[in-house]
Amino acid sequence: VLTAEDRRLLQASVGKLGCRLEDIGADALNRLLITFPQSKTYFSHFNLSPGSKDIIHQGEKVGKALDSALKHLDDIRGTLSQLSDLHAYNLRVDPVNFQLLSKCIHVSLATHLRNEYSASVTLAWDKFLELVADVLSEKYR
């Protein structure tokens, strides 16, 4: 459960990023494909070269979804419902990949925020990303 302090820390850290969440999403997706090559199976029709336009475009979608979820924390399930349907019913993405991507998002955030990515900020993001992964995985049940 995200506390009021978690919400405050999330919003404050986004304001300190110095880039858009779309850039974080693109960086994180690039890291995912390099670090966890098994995730490439979902992107066989993409140019999977690091930094390719396909990866950047898809990563920007990840960032936009995170931004939308952050703006609608009180209705995160409703906000991500269509995305959850897409991943469960059409793309059939193994839910473990949401956890792997979360790890990569943490690295991207830490890279951009540096000293601002304190233990409390890390915990707030961890709770948020866990919630997002849970919402995206719930249609699999």
UniProtKB/Swiss-Prot annotation:
GO terms of molecular function: haptoglobin binding; heme binding; metal ion binding; organic acid binding; oxygen binding; oxygen carrier activity; peroxidase activity
Signal peptide interval: none
Self-association state and partner proteins as the record states: The deoxy-Hb is a heterotetramer of two alpha and two beta chains, but oxygenation results in dissociation to dimers.
CDD domains per the UniProt record, alphabetical: Hb-alpha-like
Keyword entries, A-Z: Heme, Iron, Metal-binding, Oxygen transport, Transport
Pfam name, any one: Globin
Organism: Erythrolamprus miliaris
Summary of the function given for this chain in its UniProt record: Involved in oxygen transport from the lung to the various peripheral tissues.
GO BP term, pick one: hydrogen peroxide catabolic process
Tagged with keyword Iron: yes
Residues the entry annotates as binding heme b: 57, 87
Family: Belongs to the globin family.
Record field: transmembrane: none
Tissue expression notes: Red blood cells.
Protein name (record): Hemoglobin subunit alpha-D
Domain Globin stretches: 1-141
Taxonomic superkingdom: Eukaryota
Keyword Repeat: no
Record PANTHER family: HEMOGLOBIN FAMILY MEMBER, HEMOGLOBIN SUBUNIT ALPHA
PROSITE patterns: GLOBIN
